[in-house]
């Protein structure tokens, strides 16, 4: 039995570090490169497991070297991989990441690969019942995400949706969500309210509650968080500054 089921994608992050990010038509010499686990769902599963949670990870991989890398990495973090589908027709997802080592800025191209072909018929839906919490994002096909959210809610789980990458959602989505965790840009996408400060974030959170979501957590980077439920709003100051944020490159290096 797992504490939490994560539905999401794995992509092999291929990161190139150098003094700059190449522009169109330019070839540059980099300093180093690294290959490691990526994808929001994969990163969330690893983070939860390292915090002591038991994780069931649902995804789809290609039957290739990167797929084997994924299984190996997940198993090393004690994540249940028994509900990952392996495809002989599709490749494992990859992301090419150019990183400017001086500024930390990056440019990323993601090819989702196998997860983009995931269907409801392939998922062992009943494995979700063995968890207390269901967590997902918007990297898996929308119809699959909605199917799993609905099943999880009907099975009594707490549903958490990290709405990234932001995309248009039907009203059906919101009634199955207990916790909605957008960042500033994603909150603006769903509410139309541009967030320049905490007051804007509070207004955005209030509007999301009015759309039918039970609890909203808007992440504001180093500015902290805004947490909103029907009768209460909480302004969390500077919480992020006191926490070590482990970025993708550090996760890759374990």
Language-model regions, residue ranges each:
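Glycine-rich phosphate/adenosyl-contacting loop at the front of the ribokinase-like
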Residues: 1-60, 65-79, 243-251
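Conserved phosphate-binding/catalytic loop of the ribokinase/pfkB sugar-kinase fold
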Residues: 86-87, 97-133, 138
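Short beta-strand scaffold segments in enzyme catalytic cores
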Residues: 46, 94-98, 107, 224-228
């Amino acid at each position: 039995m797992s504490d939490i089921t994560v539905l999401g994608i794995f992509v092999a992050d291929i990161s190139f570090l150098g003094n700059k990010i190449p522009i169109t038509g330019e070839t540059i010499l980099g300093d180093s490169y690294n290959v490691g686990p990526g994808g929001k769902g994969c990163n969330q599963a690893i983070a939860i497991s390292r915090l002591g949670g038991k994780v069931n990870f649902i995804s789809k991989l290609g039957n290739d070297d990167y797929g084997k890398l994924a299984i190996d990495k997940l198993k090393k973090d004690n994540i249940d991989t028994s509900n990952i589908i392996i495809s002989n027709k599709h490749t494992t997802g990859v992301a090419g990441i150019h990183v400017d080592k001086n500024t930390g800025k990056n440019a990323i191209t993601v090819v989702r690969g196998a997860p983009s072909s995931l269907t409801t018929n392939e998922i062992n839906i009943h494995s979700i019942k063995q968890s207390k919490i269901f967590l997902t994002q918007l990297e898996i096909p929308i119809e699959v995400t909605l199917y799993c959210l609905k099943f999880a809610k009907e099975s009594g789980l707490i549903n958490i949706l990290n709405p990234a990458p932001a995309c248009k959602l039907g009203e059906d989505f919101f009634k199955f969500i207990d916790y909605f965790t957008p960042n500033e840009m994603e909150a603006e996408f769903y509410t139309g309210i541009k967030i320049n400060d905490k007051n804007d974030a509070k207004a955005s959170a209030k509007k999301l509650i009015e759309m039918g979501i039970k609890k909203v957590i808007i992440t504001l980077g180093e500015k902290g968080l805004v947490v909103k439920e029907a009768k209460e709003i909480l302004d969390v100051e500077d919480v992020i500054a006191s926490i070590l944020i482990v970025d993708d490159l550090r996760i890759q290096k374990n």
